Amino acid sequence: VRDRLDGARQDAGLRVMKEEEFYKNKPKNVVKIEQDRVWRYTGTDHASGTIAVQYYFGGETSANLCDFFIYMMQAKADTLKDPFRGVPRMVMLDPGSANTSAAFKNLCKSLDVHVQINKPGNPRAKGQVEKANDIVETAFESGLRFTEIHDIDQLNRLAEHWMRYYNGTQKHSRHGMTRYQAWNKIK
């Protein structure tokens, strides 16, 4: 938040939390900004390795999870540049409260999607998503420090632009194709 010339205060946009201000020994500082924190949702397709990412306010909620799941399934504005869409047969998640919520389970049931909740302490079960998070952090978010982000919509537009670039140009080591090339081979 910064002061304007007329004395009013306005938000200065999204920014990284300072580690010395927000850490485990200062929980009240974290609680104050809880609803303003930006949460990243990352999903992948197992066969192609395609990565999807979106950002949300409000934490890990069933509403945010359902919105992200629908975002992953729906056709994007330009399906030639971003062909990733469709209803999966199965979704694999960790046992978080949003992931096991009635809202998400009902959405999946209505779409005939099997929900596989991984057992706690089995990190290999979600290794692909962990690697996708690493890729998002190093290949996309690391460059955000050079960009002034004004709102979450701008952040999501940048994320979509990056996803089209990354999924469309970077070859996956497992199958030797770009993620979108592999996606387009799925029948």
Q: PLM features: what roles do these ranges have?
A:
Residues 47-50:
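Short, glycine-anchored, charge-dense loop/turn motifs used at functional sites
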Residues 54-82:
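Active-site beta-loop-alpha junctions of metal-dependent nucleic acid enzymes
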Residues 55, 90-94:
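Short catalytic-loop micro-motif centered on adjacent basic/acidic residues
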Residues 72-80, 95, 111, 115, ...:
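A generic secondary-structure signal for well-formed alpha-helical elements
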Residues 86-88:
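A general structural motif
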Residues 93-94, 101-111, 115-141, 153-156, ...:
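RNase H-like two-metal-ion nuclease catalytic core shared by retroviral integrases
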